[in-house]
Design a protein with these regions (language model features):
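An N-terminally biased module of ancient metal coordination in phosphate/nucleic-acid-related enzymes
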Residues: 1-61
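H/E-rich (His + Asp/Glu) clusters that bind or coordinate divalent metals
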Residues: 181-244
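Hydrophobic faces of well-ordered beta-strands that scaffold small-molecule active sites
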Residues: 3-7, 50-54, 82-86, 108-112, ...
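Short aromatic-enriched loop/helix-cap "lid" or pocket-rim segments at secondary-structure transitions
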Residues: 13-18, 64-66, 98, 152-154, ...
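Acidic (Asp/Glu)-rich catalytic clusters
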Residues: 40-47, 67-81, 97-107, 127-136, ...
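Short, well-structured secondary-structure segments
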Residues: 47-62, 69-89, 111
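Short, surface-exposed alpha-helical segments at coil->helix boundaries
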Residues: 33-37, 64-71, 158
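Divalent metal-binding pocket/active-site signature
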Residues: 32-33, 57-61, 90-93, 105-189
């Protein structure tokens, strides 16, 4: 069985517009149309059995609507093969209430994205969210490292992760993009071997640049990718694509 642990979908009404914005920022080609149906089609084409959708809450007021969609997607899992995590924003003061709702709805975890939520990962608000999520037994996935759509400031660095690990001691923290996108030397030196998981999303292979786009970034080399796996342990690495 193949599980893609890191995917994204958008409501049909806004999928095209959202994907257009992401493409304009990243200068890369999408692999699907960003809809749930598009994800399911790509799963069939590539032989993926289960996909986990990781919603990103970019403003506090979005949390109720986004989590309602997550519940609906997850309720249809048997027929779709798609499971959704919940979302939360550091600006949500009622974070315990939100996390309790996510837990009671049967969702298995949450996604945090410090870049799109404009907060540093070692912010006390994230620490509180992660601490309570850990109490509830929820998985916490966080975008780690550079985001090519918002590259000017990195909101989740290996040093910030070390601080959270030392202070909060989360049991099920997953660092997307092999621990820190484009910061893999630091990840190797500071995070490999720590009590944390990493996913492979958008970390190995070739970037599908738009025609004429400046090739500013590269994914991890095969040598670095294997170094990270060997140093951290394959049992702590989760497969993910970052679809679309």
């Amino acid at each position: 069985m193949i599980v893609d642990f890191h995917t994204h979908t958008y409501p049909d009404k806004i999928a095209s517009k959202t994907l257009e914005l992401l493409v304009s920022r990243s200068k890369t080609k999408p692999a699907s149309d960003g809809t749930l149906a598009g994800l399911q089609h790509s799963m069939t084409q590539s032989g993926v059995d289960i996909s986990v959708v990781l919603p990103v809450v970019t403003a506090p007021h979005q949390v109720e609507r986004i989590n309602a969609v997550a519940k609906t997607v997850t309720a249809q899992f048997t027929g779709s093969g798609v499971w959704s995590f919940g979302g939360i924003h550091p600006g949500n003061d009622n974070y315990k209430e939100i996390l309790n709702g996510i837990k009671s709805a049967g969702l298995k975890g949450i996604k945090l994205h410090p870049d799109y939520q404009d907060a540093m990962f070692n912010d006390i608000r994230y620490k509180r969210i992660i601490s309570y999520a850990t109490e509830l037994g929820l998985v916490v996935v966080v975008h780690a490292g550079v985001d090519i759509g918002l590259p000017s400031v990195t909101h989740c660095t290996p040093d910030m992760v070390c601080e959270v690990l030392d202070e909060v001691q989360p049991e099920r923290l997953v660092l997307a993009h092999m621990g820190g996108w484009n910061l893999w030397d630091e990840v190797l030196a500071k995070l490999c071997g720590r009590n944390v998981y990493m996913d492979t999303a958008f970390s190995y292979g070739e970037i599908a640049w738009l025609s004429g786009a400046e090739h500013r970034w590269k994914l991890a080399s095969e040598e670095m990718f294997l170094k990270l796996i060997r140093a951290h342990g394959a049992d702590r690495i989760v497969f993910g694509t970052d679809s679309p």
